[in-house]
Amino acid sequence: GGFDFSFLPQPPQEKGHDGGRYYRAKQGVGLGPGPMGLMGPRGPPGASGAPGPQGFPAGEPGEPGQTGPAGARGPAGPPGKADGHPGKPGRPGERGVVGPQGARGFPGTPGLPGFKGIRGHNGLDGLKGQPGAPGVKGEPGAPGENGTPGQTGARGLPGERGRVGAPGPAGARGSDGSVGPVGPAGPIGSAGPPGFPGAPGPKGELGPVGNTGPSGPAGPRGEQGLPGVSGPVGPPGNPGANGLTGAKGAAGLPGVAGAPGLPGPRGIPGPVGASGATGARGLVGEPGPAGSKGESGNKGEPGSAGPQGPPGSSGEEGKRGPNGESGSTGPTGPPGLRGGPGSRGLPGADGRAGVIGPAGARGASGPAGVRGPSGDTGRPGEPGLMGARGLPGSPGNVGPAGKEGPAGLPGIDGRPGPIGPAGARGEAGNIGFPGPKGPAGDPGKGEKGHAGLAGNRGQGGKGEQGPAGPPGFQGLPGPAGTTGEAGKPGERGIPGEFGLPGPAGPRGERGPPGESGAVGPSGAIGSRGPSGPPGPDGNKGEPGVVGAPGTAGPAGSGGLPGERGAAGMPGGKGEKGELGLRGEVGTTGRDGARGAPGAVGAPGPAGATGDRGEAGAAGPAGPAGPRGSPGERGEVGPAGPNGFAGPAGAAGQPGAKGERGTKGPKGENGIVGPTGPVGSAGPAGPNGPAGPAGSRGDGGPPGATGFPGAAGRTGPPGPSGITGPPGPPGAAGKEGLRGPRGDQGPVGRTGETGAGGPPGFTGEKGPSGEPGTAGPPGTAGPQGLLGAPGILGLPGSRGERGLPGVAGAVGEPGPLGIGPPGARGPPGAVGSPGVNGAPGNPGSDGPPGRDGLPGHKGERGYAGNAGPVGAAGAPGPHGTVGPAGKHGNRGEPGPVGSVGPVGALGPRGPSGPQGIRGDKGEPGDKGPRGLPGLKGHNGLQGLPGLAGQHGDQGPGPVGPAGPRGPAGPSGPAGKDGRTGHPGAVGPAGIRGSGGGYDFGYEGDFYRA
């Protein structure tokens, strides 16, 4: 029952309700037909309102109520939030039970005027109704006044052709009025918009039955005009007398539809009609579109950097990285200015004896230096393997141990004085910066003396390692020992008998710094002096490119061995550095002309490491010396401190103290790479930290030279053990066979160089080990194969570091003694790095000495500035690999480095798993009302509706039927008459079931 307001905005359908495109008005009891309102203009579509409350069950269909005026447009609902999920379409609700017919409701608020529909098809002609019973002819009524013609409505869009509705309820029979004159056929007006059906007008009084007039000829069927606007309803005429019922004429063709009449006055409510059939279940409406996605918020300003986090925990010791590829040798830098030697520190543990190289060509003897006053006799050092003679340096006298003084200006190298008597072995001082090479003196003319026996190793004390002070002034050259006669220049002397190194002579007073002399030819490397105290470890730097091997220089005449140079100031112990990459072992080079100091020998047994002090400024790193061939490889330990260099070559200018860099990530220890050719010896670099002391084994007898053994794999470094007192060095073992070159491992990742701290005080030197037995002096033979490493001695206890003393002057070098290599002493502490000297020609490599006990790995020091890369020396013999040292304490993490550039964009990673669907968001606020949509296309014409069935006669306020008259004869079919004026609208009869007509808009049908 009721009208179909499907064009109104539809409320959302709840589950279980009859949804669909048809918005059916609730049925209720009407109060009678009302006047029909004019079609209003099309309003913009309204926003969806909130769902209305559940309506009452359907009432019994009542008579259509009068159409009220078009209601005002309701306010737009609040904007919905745009982030709601689109609802899923609800399932069609179950068909509700047809409720009892409710009482006719009051007329509802008139809905919004519908959109103008497309003109519908002409409906099929309704079935001819059964002829009604002839009514009693009433009195002819007074002719009614012609109503004012209604205004012609604007032509509406053609509606779809509606289905032929069922015949409407029969209106109550009105009184027959007098037949008015047939008016002229008016022009077919434009079809107005379909208005709502007007309510029936008030029932007219029954007039007397009039006589039936003759049937007029049926007029031609007029075209169906569009519904025009109804004219006003005229007042009812006076009822005439009931006329006799005339014979029913033949049904004429439908005439042109007149314009709909204006709504009549509201009638009295009729009785409640019977319950109408339940309408068909509506289609479920489609879900509304999802709300538009909210716009992304503006990107916030980048947040300020947070505070620096605490330093991260120390990582595990990385495995040793493999050796890097050999880089090309960089150009030799110019000799730097000679730095003033630092005050002498307490002696560090002896370094490993270097490999004795064949005597180089003897250089011209330099002029004798002024003899300095004799210093205190130092303790005899461990005999080291004889290296190629270097140019004599200018050690100063050993002064009393003082605190580090400021660095003095470089002095001029003094001439070497005569070799003084061997004094007691003094405490090893800090390693000073290498001084510039002096001019080569004329060869001495004395005979070579026998090498003295090695003195006992001194006891080491235990001192706190203080910060290394700046280098002291270079002392005056000490008294030189008696100079032997220099050999003729260039002539190779017959190697003398190998004597044990005698005790070092006293240091002379330090003379004023001299000007750097011109670089003389490289002399033979002198005996390896005891290592100075360990200097600070530098931060692990990036591995430099390995220089290409240089060609061996021509053999120079062997110079006389110089006295041990003054020890430089000890650098403070730095933080524990990363394990460096093992360099390639070089092959033995030929005797070169006298050049800069030869390769540093293998470290001796480790002395006790002093407490970590502040690191001194690191000097530039010198070029790598020749590597020995690897023996059987034990666990690779950190490198022990280097022994004292031979007489220094011309010193390079000390580099500026670098700022401490941020500590980089610890690199993995790489596998030991294959031995590369040895480059030409550069100036001695800073000593590395002492390796951990291994257990001292008994010295085995010298073994026969074996074949080279295969290199063993590097084991992981063990934890640091407690440093024991240094034991006496074991006897030298036999040389082992030369092992094959190991594969070069990948380069480990280095940390960033930290800024050098101030040098710390050096600890006292640990006790010396027992000297190894010296072999009988013999003539130098060809270099033999490497012997197997001897058993390592027990580590010595860590001595306290004393204050550095002033270095004495270097005496003239004595004759080069020839003898078997002595036992390797413990490595001394690492001193401050010296200034790089200009690289000299490579000296001849001697046979490798035995491996000493590894010392404890020292704390990591600050890295110094890198020195110029020296020319590659001739390959030296393969040295034996020392036992692995224990890892030292890990250094404090450096400050965070600056952020590097953004790396290249990596490949896109795989898509992550689909996240869990988030909770449904709160519905957003309803957006502002949109602009009215464009008018849709005209809908397709609907199919012609089926003819409706006859409605049942309802119990309307119909008057009593008159007696049925006799049926008159059917007259001939008359012609179509002209359209008459619209008569008064009769009262609505009972509504027929079904039928109606549809008019479409935008493809949808609306049922009226």
Curated annotation (Swiss-Prot):
Expressed in bones. It is found in: Secreted; Secreted, Extracellular space; Secreted, Extracellular space, Extracellular matrix. The modification 4-hydroxyproline is found at P9, P12, P45, P51, P380, P383. Residues 1-999 are annotated as: Disordered. Type I collagen is a member of group I collagen (fibrillar forming collagen). The modification 5-hydroxylysine is found at K116. One of its GO terms (cellular component) is extracellular region. These protein fragments were extracted from ancient femur bone collected at Rampart Cave in Arizona, USA and around 28580 years old. Residues 82-94, 657-666, 917-928 have a biased composition (Basic and acidic residues). The keyword Glycoprotein applies. Residues 38-81, 164-193, 239-260, 301-314, 358-374, 409-428, 513-530, 542-552, 582-629, 636-656, 674-684, 704-714, 768-795, 803-813, 826-842, 862-884, 892-907 have a biased composition (Low complexity). This is Collagen alpha-2(I) chain. Glycans are attached at K116. Its main location: secreted. Residues 336-345, 455-466, 553-562, 694-703, 751-760, 989-998 have a biased composition (Gly residues). It comes from the Eukaryota.
